[in-house]
Amino acid sequence: MMTRLMSFLLLAGCPSLASQAVNPKSSDTPALQVSTSQLKNSRFHIVLDYHYNLGLSQRIGSQTQGRNETYRMGGNSLHLTAMYDFTEKFSAGAGIGADRYTNSDFNTFPVYAAFRYRPLSRIPAAYVYTNAGYGLFKSVNIYAGWMGDLGIGYQYMLRKHFGLNFQLGYNLKEFAGIESYAYDPSTGQTTFLGKKSAVRHSVSFGFGLVF
């Protein structure tokens, strides 16, 4: 009787032992899947970008000045942006910048919203982007005004939270509240004419770091 009981228990336990031998780490699989998913879905990034803005033209009041040999408009900007990937194709965020435009010289500190869209599934690192914002601060040599960007970019991630960012686009910037004066050489008097706004159009070349 005892021999028959032992034989029955051995036969009943064999399928369970065989199942564990085939897949000994089955209980660990869900944890591994979660870890892999979290690694792939790192959705939040900080981007620090430098841009050189090659000025094409500028309008002040009713006068428009194009780029030429003696009037070489330029500019440098440093932008810090927080981006979040809502989907595999769409990202949005917000940022703040410190911009210096030259010839004529203007300083501005814009706060802006940033949007990216990745239309190519075969090249997920490539995207189109647009930014829209406003320069909040205004004082001597610092001007408020609207700003906007539109262009293409490429973000190459070397690690989970470190990569390179490249952008090429169009930059539109308004400088509001520019004081205008008229000088009369015959009398030596200067007359205040009021305040005007300048609008500059530029090609923007950008390089940055992604964290």
Role assignments for model-derived ranges:
Residues 1-40:
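Cleavable N-terminal export/targeting peptides
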Residues 30, 61-66, 133-136, 186-192:
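Extracytoplasmic loops and strand-loop junctions of Gram-negative outer membrane beta-barrel proteins
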Residues 50-56, 76-151, 156-164, 209:
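Gram-negative (and chloroplast) outer-membrane scaffold detector with strong preference
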Residues 37-58:
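Transmembrane beta-strand segments of Gram-negative outer membrane beta-barrel proteins
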Residues 197-211:
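Outer-membrane beta-barrel "beta-signal"
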Residues 60-62, 106, 176-180:
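Outer-membrane beta-barrel and related beta-rich outer-membrane complex signature
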Residues 63-67, 110, 145-149, 181-189:
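Flexible, surface-exposed loop regions and adjacent strand-edge segments
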